[in-house]
Amino acid sequence: MDAYIEFRNVVKKFDDFVALDHVSLQIPKGAFVTLLGPSGCGKTTLMRQLAGFSEPEEGDVLVDGKRMNGLPPFKRNTPLVFQEYALFPHMTVYENISYGLKLKKAPKEEKDRKVAEMLEMFNLQGLDGRFPKQLSGGQQQRVAFARALVMGQEILLLDEPLSNLDAKLRVEVRTELRQIQQKFGITTMYVTHDQDEALSMSDIIAVMRKGRIEQVGTPWEIYFRPANRFVADFVGTVN
């Protein structure tokens, strides 16, 4: 397996607490990889090392063979979508989606074209003039996805992005997201504690506990061939 994203012996500490304990993980280009585990196991902390919001004390983070350590987030091209969406409340849907293009000083024609593509991709046509407070939770989440991808990024980081949606809408949005990810070959890292979500969406699952990776494998391998009792118990709670 050729690694497009790679974590090499990454260590992250908060005072005396070891959040990541020599974590290594390889992610191939175009894969949908889920970090799965209970709260506090290090999932989001590992993702933040890739996004650039945190730096490891030891180890390396690489994308396409290039070391990311020390680079600020805006130079990494690794957009992160949070569960709170983080939309600008005073901006319309169009302005939220096109914000990165505005910072890049893209011409209006390019902004209009790319925003139109995102509106169609995420079924948001006709909502470009609305403000976030005028949207449903599912629509707000789609706007957050569109804003993250409008610059043509090849990597997408998702930190429990569906946890604020009701069960039916969560299934609907995750199906859309997976279809878009597969269509465009976006290398995606997804954080969740929801076993069903991980098993239904992922190419690869990395099960984490106490700052370490317990097992990496396909959903089938994780479910039917767990590496240890923890993985079996944690994943086996799916109905």
Segments from the language model and where they lie:
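ABC ATPase nucleotide-binding domains
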Residues: 76-79, 83-230
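Conserved ABC transporter NBD signature motif
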Residues: 59-67
